[in-house]
Amino acid sequence: SPREMATTMKPEQVTGVARDLGTKLRERGITMDFAPVLDVDGGSANGAIGDRSFSGDPAVAATYATAFAQGLREAGIEPVYKHFPGHGRASGDTHKQTSRTPALASLKEVDLPPFGKALSQVPAPVMLGHLVVPEWGDLPATLNPAAYNLLRSGDYPEGSPYDGVIVTDDLSGMKAISDRFSTPTAALTALTAGADIALWITTDDLPKAIDEVDAAVTDGRYPREKFEASFARATSLQPDK
């Protein structure tokens, strides 16, 4: 687990582990890994992240997540940092229920700095979590323009402006979303809020989602220039042949 790696290995050893893993993934035709977790562990109150977090210390979490991302990158695999703006101290498991974070000021003190540090050292895509931040109302971060604006602006400690790819967590199989929204509605809401890639785990709703996005671009609810910018960012991840 990431926790075990952080307590038993040096960062350069973790880079080697990730490089070996990435090599095996690439041999199987996989070019992206939705890892590493940048969440800062909040203790037993949040079992959703647990030992997927490298550490409860923001600096340690950032160091080891960056080392892991570097190893994947060296193997030709695109890493993805998650779960912005920080799941480690949130209440509840987004697979099962709504999950609420501490106040934004607390996120900026503890949970957000690792994202800034990691992105400055090994730039990579970022996955948003289905996290409700008190100051942003009741809409989860994956569907909330405020979350995308914060990530893009870099307006948090250690942060800087970000123009990379942003992907959502799963929009179809996690109750924090599926209890409230259909998959096509969630996908369109995420894209118009600022996501570049709307992720879900089945193809069942794909035709309807495509139709809804097409209609939204046509009628202006999803501005064409915004759609084209996201498309350009997403397709920039296509691997070298």
Give the location of each predicted region.
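A substrate-binding/cap region within the structured catalytic cores of diverse enzymes
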Residues: 1-73
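Hydrophobic face of alpha-helices
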Residues: 18, 65, 210, 228-231
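Mid-to-C-terminal alpha-helical segments outside catalytic/metal-binding sites
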Residues: 215, 219-241
